[in-house]
């Protein structure tokens, strides 16, 4: 008899085979990290079923099996090998295997050229990811499949990890998106992650097997893979057991089953993990800590004692917080609970309950803040809206007038506010990753079977907190599970996670030069700081005592109530907040639709309320609301796009069509190459600028998921050109850019410079004999060398092109480029002058040339101009700064063309009080790790605020809107909170 055990990251599978390979017994269960106990239970069940079985050939496989085999002296079979053996034995002729496990994902390419691709320590796009998303949608995991079957639309969602996806899904939930559509979107995200992250450009075709729990139990997930791959995969019988059966097929050594329990118990008793000092040495130390933090408090009252009040609502990423405040600042009533994916229901229930219980207490005015601000304000007629950073500032300043630093850690957001002379001096916000936030702890608490409150209390008694570093949630999943296998208690894991949250906040977001740089009067707030472990860890790490208000979790709502009171005092009026009768007639319906008014094809969520009031979300311009085209007269991004669209086309080409992929440096050099190629007798056809399907066209050929999104798009651009039947494609490698004088050198970044090589290596059609892909190395620094290189390049396919033709074409190209450059600067100056005449703030939306691509920037430019600001790009102002003088002040080597413009733009903004810089940074851009710090330094040393927005393929602008509004509010530009 042969026995195989597959101990995965979340489940354990056993397969018992007879000598002929027939399956006699099998089981599939979750182990909740209690691996030794689960094996013992399976052993007992096996002995009951086969009472005469004393020994068998036994082997163990799976990511959780190595520790067991090492400690018990058993045979270990690598899971890829086990799966390969089983697939080849049971399903001959299989070309590829796709398996999704709890935290593991793999693709096996079988046949002559065997290859295995596995995820590393990131568990994005696996079963654990789907579990997290189900929890976020407040449904059981099996219900995800039922929901997806009823979907009508799909949204773009990241599946890199659970917390990134929360950042995408939560705003959609708060805007009223249907759970059915979100479930389908999650499955598509998982399929996309597996294909781009694992296949890395290798085509998946032929006979494909789907294995593992998620693909077995969820037909819609299989459909998503079929759709993306354009195949029809097969989920075979016993698909959950392939690794276990493969291990059984490979079992070589006979094992005495009667002594196995003793070995397992001995192994389970071992403890070996890295740990930190305890948060509290004894109970007395904790008592002193609690007493100190009970001093800072808001006075508490009841609605029964007040005839008038103000209400603040904080519709956060994962929770709803409500504060009712008396005119003298007492907290009369409060509400704090998970929004369970539907903030509208939570607010309606609270208001109905409040009006019913306290009919004598009149609400004078209300304000709402947070992710769900727009939805709640429209639905319930809330008087005012306020960006959450300002709401938290007002609350902290009310409690501690001398506050100079505020740290707020919420469900998914981290806000750090530097205060100087009673006003916000600087703002730090976490990026799209929310690993150091409350949802991070909540996720682990739920995985381990506790509420967040229970988990926090347990951590207080930890004697050896596990040292987990400061990594993201799914990266840390593996560390936590390993610590459990090494004997760490839940208390030590809870304390260790609390410490890791603090380290993430300090060293990934705030990054202070010293503890003195943070301040002396520090207020910490947000629901996460209600956890005494997190608060203690912060104080220990910084060696500082801080202030935690008694309403730390309600500060956003309390600040909103204070703001409502301030606005009401300035202009008393009858509140527009729905009354009890109106709440009784309250109706809320949600419908998804696609906007067809432009090429963006935005997925709109239309919320309809009683009386026909509508709130539309998901739009990236005002056209679905106003039915008028956006006005872009003060938007240089759109004007640059228009200049590119208006480039002349050679309609009488003597040499046919030349295709250009419209991405990366082509957004700057298209005028140059268009003039050159047109002069040589080609009609230039570039791939579309605003086609949202471009990414999907090339998705299967992307070799690395870590490269920036603009580079990933290039695969789709090439595919589009090939689909049009274009046989000439021009996309040269370019180490150097045009020399703008003054910088140490004029390099392109490695991705911009050499990505044509990547495309040639991964898109097989480019190697067809009928396709001419011109990707030679060219430089624009020396005209003579350029002429020579162009002649050599074109000689392969067009030997009739003469040197004289090329020389004239190069001259025409430089003329066209410098003309385009002059037009950009002139238009930029016109926008600046007009903005100053109209007293509008000016935003320099600084990035790289390709950031004007609407697919890349997701119309952030229009979001800014819709708020009432004028917008120019970095190249419109960078020439105003003398680069050689700037170089002396820089702390980095200024040798990259794009970087030089960013530094010059930051310097220019620092010198002009009516200008504000927002830097666009693409995820995965290593170069911008340098530029971001240097631009921040250049601005902050002159007392200016630096704002950064990270962008990739996710087009929900909720977080970006908060950053932009925070900048405008902190700079006191205008009352952006009431727009």
Question: Language model features by range: what are they?
Answer:
Residues 34-35, 112-153, 240-243, 249-253, ...:
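Glycine-rich phosphate-binding loop plus the immediately following alpha-helix
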Residues 64, 199-228, 239-243, 369-372, ...:
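Glycine-rich phosphate-binding loops at beta-strand->alpha-helix junctions
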Residues 119, 123-130, 433-441, 448, ...:
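An N-terminal assembly and electron-transfer interface module characteristic of large anaerobic redox
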Residues 4-44, 115-116, 120, 313-345, ...:
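Short glycine-rich, Thr/Ser-proximal phosphate-binding strand/loop in the N-terminal lobe
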Residues 127-132, 237-271, 394, 438-443, ...:
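Glycine-rich phosphate-binding/hydrolytic loop that grips phosphoryl groups
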Residues 76-80, 226-245, 383-390, 539-558, ...:
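Conserved phosphate-binding/catalytic loops in two-lobed NTP-binding clefts
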Residues 182-206, 247, 290-299, 496-519, ...:
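Phosphate/ATP-binding catalytic cores across multiple sugar-kinase/actin-like superfamilies
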Residues 1-20, 94-111, 300-332, 403-420, ...:
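Gly/Thr-rich phosphate-binding beta-strand-loop-beta motif of the actin/hexokinase/Hsp70
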């Amino acid at each position: 008899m042969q026995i195989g055990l597959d101990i995965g990251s979340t489940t354990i599978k056993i397969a018992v085979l007879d000598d002929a390979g027939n399956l006699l017994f099998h089981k599939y269960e979750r182990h909740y990290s209690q691996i030794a106990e689960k094996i013992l239970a399976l052993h007992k069940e096996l002995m009951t079923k086969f009472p005469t079985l004393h020994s068998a050939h036994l082997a163990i496989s799976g990511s959780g099996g190595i520790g067991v085999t090492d400690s018990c002296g058993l045979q270990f079979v690598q899971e890829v090998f086990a799966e390969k053996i089983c697939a080849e034995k049971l399903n001959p002729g299989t070309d590829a295997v796709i398996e999704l496990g709890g935290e593991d994902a793999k693709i096996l390419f079988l046949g002559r050229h065997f290859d295995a691709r596995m995820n590393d320590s990131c568990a994005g796009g696996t079963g654990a990811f789907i579990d997290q998303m189900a929890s976020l949608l407040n449904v059981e995991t099996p219900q995800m499949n039922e929901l997806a079957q009823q979907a009508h639309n799909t949204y773009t969602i990241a599946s890199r990890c659970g917390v990134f996806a929360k950042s995408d899904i939560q705003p959609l939930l708060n805007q009223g998106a249907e759970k059915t559509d979100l479930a389908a979107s999650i499955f598509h995200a998982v399929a996309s992650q597996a294909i781009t992250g694992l296949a890395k450009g290798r085509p998946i075709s032929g006979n494909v097997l789907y294995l593992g729990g998620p693909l077995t139990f969820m037909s819609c997930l299989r459909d998503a893979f079929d759709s993306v791959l354009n195949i029809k995969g097969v989920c075979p019988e016993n698909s959950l057991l392939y690794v276990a059966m493969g291990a059984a097929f490979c079992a070589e050594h006979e094992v005495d089953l009667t002594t196995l329990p003793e070995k397992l118990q001995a192994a389970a008793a071992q403890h070996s993990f890295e740990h930190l000092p305890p948060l509290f040495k004894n109970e007395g130390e904790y008592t002193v800590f609690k007493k100190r933090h009970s001093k800072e408090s808001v006075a508490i009252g009841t609605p029964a004692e007040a005839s008038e009040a103000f209400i603040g609502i904080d519709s956060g990423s994962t929770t709803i917080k409500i504060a009712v405040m008396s005119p003298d600042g007492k907290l009369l009533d409060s509400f704090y609970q998970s929004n369970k994916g539907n903030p509208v229901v939570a607010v309606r229930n609270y208001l109905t309950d409040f009006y019913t219980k306290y009919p004598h207490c009149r609400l004078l005015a209300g304000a709402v803040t947070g992710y769900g601000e727009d939805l709640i304000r429209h639905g319930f007629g809330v008087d005012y809206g306020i960006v959450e950073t300002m709401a938290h500032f007002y609350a902290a300043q009310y409690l501690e007038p001398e506050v100079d630093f505020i740290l707020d850690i919420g469900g998914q957001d981290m806000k750090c506010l530097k205060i100087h002379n009673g006003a916000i001096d600087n703002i730090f916000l976490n990026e799209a990753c929310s690993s150091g936030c409350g949802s991070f702890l909540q996720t682990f608490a739920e995985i381990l079977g506790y509420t967040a409150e229970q988990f926090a209390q347990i951590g207080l008694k930890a004697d050896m907190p596990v040292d987990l570093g400061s990594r993201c949630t799914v990266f840390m999943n593996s560390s936590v599970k390993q610590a459990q296998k090494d004997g760490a208690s839940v208390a030590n894991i809870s304390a260790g996670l609390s410490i890791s949250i603090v380290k993430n906040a300090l060293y990934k977001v705030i990054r202070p030069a010293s503890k003195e740089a943070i301040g002396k009067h520090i207020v910490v707030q947000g629901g996460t700081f209600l956890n005494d472990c997190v608060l203690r860890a912060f104080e220990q790490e910084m060696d500082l005592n801080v202030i935690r208000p008694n309403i730390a979790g309600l500060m956003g709502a309390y600040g909103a109530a204070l703001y409502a009171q301030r606005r009401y005092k300035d202009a008393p009026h009858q509140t527009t907040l729905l009354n009890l009768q109106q709440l009784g007639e309250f109706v809320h319906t949600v419908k998804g639709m696609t906007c067809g008014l432009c090429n963006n094809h935005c997925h709109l969520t239309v919320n309809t309320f009683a009386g026909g009031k509508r709130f539309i979300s998901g739009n990236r311009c005002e056209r679905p609301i106003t039915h008028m085209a956006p006005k872009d007269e003060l938007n240089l991004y759109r004007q640059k796009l228009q200049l590119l669209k208006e480039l002349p086309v050679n309609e009488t080409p003597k040499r046919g069509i030349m295709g250009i992929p419209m991405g990366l440096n082509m957004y700057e050099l298209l005028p140059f190459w268009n003039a050159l190629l047109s002069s040589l007798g080609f009609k230039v056809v570039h791939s579309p600028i605003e086609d949202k399907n471009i990414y999907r066209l090339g998705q299967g050929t992307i070799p690395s998921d870590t490269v920036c999104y603009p580079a990933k798009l290039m695969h789709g651009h090439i595919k589009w050109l090939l689909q049009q039947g274009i046989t000439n494609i021009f996309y040269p490698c370019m180490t150097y850019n045009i020399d703008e004088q003054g910088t140490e050198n004029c390099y392109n970044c490695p991705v911009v410079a050499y990505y044509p090589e990547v495309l040639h290596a991964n898109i097989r059609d480019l190697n067809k004999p009928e396709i001419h892909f011109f990707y030679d190395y060219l430089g624009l620094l020396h005209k003579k060398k350029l002429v020579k290189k162009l002649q050599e390049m074109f000689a392969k396919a067009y030997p009739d092109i003469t040197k004289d033709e090329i020389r004239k074409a190069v001259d025409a190209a430089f003329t066209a480029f410098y003309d385009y450059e002059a037009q950009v600067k002139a238009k930029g100056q016109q926008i600046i002058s007009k903005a100053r005449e109209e007293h509008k703030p000016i935003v320099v939306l600084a990035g790289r040339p390709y950031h004007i691509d609407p697919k890349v920037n997701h119309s952030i430019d229009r979001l800014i101009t819709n708020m009432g600001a004028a917008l120019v790009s970095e190249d419109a102002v960078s020439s105003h700064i003398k680069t050689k003088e700037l170089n002396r002040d820089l702390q980095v080597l200024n040798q990259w063309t794009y970087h030089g413009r960013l530094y010059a733009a930051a310097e220019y903004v620092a010198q002009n009080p009516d200008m504000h810089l927002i830097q666009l940074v693409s995820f995965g851009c290593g170069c911008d790790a340098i530029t971001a710090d240097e631009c921040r330094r250049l601005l902050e040393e002159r007392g200016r605020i630096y704002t950064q927005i990270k962008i990739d393929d996710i087009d929900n602008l909720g977080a970006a809107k908060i950053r932009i509004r925070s900048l405008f509010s902190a700079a006191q530009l205008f009352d952006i909170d009431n727009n």
